[in-house]
From Swiss-Prot:
<feature type="repeat" description="LRR 3">
    <location>
        <begin position="108"/>
        <end position="129"/>
    </location>
</feature>
<feature type="repeat" description="LRR 5">
    <location>
        <begin position="156"/>
        <end position="177"/>
    </location>
</feature>
<keyword id="KW-0677">Repeat</keyword>
<dbReference type="InterPro" id="IPR000483">
    <property type="entry name" value="Cys-rich_flank_reg_C"/>
</dbReference>
<dbReference type="GO" id="GO:0030425">
    <property type="term" value="C:dendrite"/>
</dbReference>
<feature type="glycosylation site" description="N-linked (GlcNAc...) asparagine">
    <location>
        <position position="297"/>
    </location>
</feature>
<dbReference type="GO" id="GO:0007602">
    <property type="term" value="P:phototransduction"/>
</dbReference>
<keyword id="KW-0433">Leucine-rich repeat</keyword>
<dbReference type="GO" id="GO:0043083">
    <property type="term" value="C:synaptic cleft"/>
</dbReference>
<dbReference type="InterPro" id="IPR003961">
    <property type="entry name" value="FN3_dom"/>
</dbReference>
<dbReference type="InterPro" id="IPR007110">
    <property type="entry name" value="Ig-like_dom"/>
</dbReference>
<dbReference type="InterPro" id="IPR036116">
    <property type="entry name" value="FN3_sf"/>
</dbReference>
<keyword id="KW-1015">Disulfide bond</keyword>
<dbReference type="InterPro" id="IPR013783">
    <property type="entry name" value="Ig-like_fold"/>
</dbReference>
<feature type="repeat" description="LRR 1">
    <location>
        <begin position="60"/>
        <end position="81"/>
    </location>
</feature>
<dbReference type="Pfam" id="PF07679">
    <property type="entry name" value="I-set"/>
</dbReference>
<feature type="signal peptide">
    <location>
        <begin position="1"/>
        <end position="21"/>
    </location>
</feature>
Amino acid sequence: MWVALGMLWLLALGGPHQAWGFCPSECSCSLRILSDGSKARTVVCSDPDLTLPPASIPPDTCKLRLERTAIRRVPGETFRPLSRLEQLWLPYNALSELSALMLRGLRRLRELRLPGNRLVTFPWAALRDTPQLQLLDLQANRLSTLPPEAAHFLENLTFLDLSNNQLMRLPEELLDVWAHLKTGPFLSGHHARLILGLQDNPWVCDCRLYDLVHLLDGWVSSNLIFIEARLRCASPRSLAGVAFSQLELRKCQSPELRPGVTSIISPLGSTVLLRCGATGIPGPEMSWRRANGRPLNGTVHQEVSSDGSSWTLLDLPVVSLFDSGDYICQAKNFLGASETLISLIVTEPQTSTGYSGIPGVLWARTGEGAEAAAYNNKLVARHVPHMPEHVALATKPSMPSIKEELALQNFQMDVPGEFSREPSEHQEAQMVRSLKVVGDTYHSVSLVWKAPQAGNTTAFSVLYAVFGHRDMRRMTVEPGKTSVTIEGLAPKTKYVACVCVRGLVPTKEQCVIFSTDEVVDAEGTQRLINMVVISVAAIIALPPTLLVCCGALRRRCHKCRTGGSAEASGAYVNLERLGHSEDSSEVLSRSSLSEGDRLLSARSSLDSQVLGVRGGRRINEYFC
């Protein structure tokens, strides 16, 4: 009986000890005696087939190493029974995620090493359960960002390795913690307060890296030591490989809009250009939208000025009443957004009499264009939006009648009051000259003009309408062109057409009146008239010409027979003497010229018979 009691006593003493010191089959365990006499157990598990942490790790384990295994995840509270654990090493596994409860109960943990895994994120809030943590090794993972709240859990660390990750930037809150170490006192004989590893990350060197670059610039504090201080840029491409010490970055700034016009009043059909500028670092993204939610009826252009300001332009080519309203310009970067409002008021077409010293003269603006036309004290121009366009060369002008010419004399373009032209605009308005009309068919006509002061980018507009009608159509001519063909005209109809620089009001000299039947028949009629005139002239001029030639030949023969000096005293005048005489005393009277001599003149009009005067001497030109 005493033997049985002894056996039970031994089992009672040895059972718990054997359970306390049990080592998992996949691991190796070792026990060492510390200086204070306590025991520290180390468990190392490196089985490549291990996919989860062992479930029966001895509770007295102080150091646990799970390395080079196939462990992909750690279930929550797996290590909670290990209340004496001080070092947890999980290097070079296949960990892709960690539970926020993984560190629950590890109040004594001082080292957490997780290098060489596949972690994209880290449960920073889990560090609340490890108040004595001093070393955190996260090198060679896939971390791309650090949240701002991570700074609250990293203040007590003395070693932090974030090298060889995918970090492009660091939060300002964390940089502020480290900047405090730079300015804090360092006590002699003490170790550095933080060893930091940030190398081998794809840093984006823009304004968001300003604080980190400034932190490394001229670093002399012994409170913080970098494992590798020569950090380098990975992007943008222009700065790839450049060391932080060689950068000159500017601090980030939120967008700030430039002051400008807040309200615009524009006539119907004119071209409106809304402009909005902003500054910011990085350069803000500019955009337009309407306050009422309607789509934009224009084109947006972006540009950057030499001082770094960003500009956006909204081009409204032909404004209508639907374009009236509030337009919002927004400038935005990662720091925030700024907006401004511009009001556009489109006025309806107006007509009024403007005298300017000339009674009965009327000015007008087109319904949807800046061009206008008025004649005979009537408003005749109103824009009709669409008209096909074709460019052709003109060859012959069409002259208006006397009545039409008088109508164009009263044709005046002007704008009253606040719309009066500046001198520069007046010069542009006079750019079109020598407008001519040529007809191709009964249904088309060509216009040509001269614009010597126009550039290659100057665009012209053509306004035309049936004579006396109010509806006027408009065509736009390509820049650099000085001719256009108007098609779709009615035969045997009188029209008025004006050409001017786009956006300006045409003058009366830039308008012409024509008729399609006159233009088409003019060429054939002119040819017939030319043929009749030439035939009649040949019949009338042939007998006198023969008579003159015979008389000249007879005088020449008579002179040869006489052999005298008749050529100086006769009625015949020597051509060389007349054309090259240097003596003013040899001036001949018109009465000394015979009718035959006059017929030999190269000019038959009255002005050709008058002796020209050049350089103080008279000159006559004659041709046989």
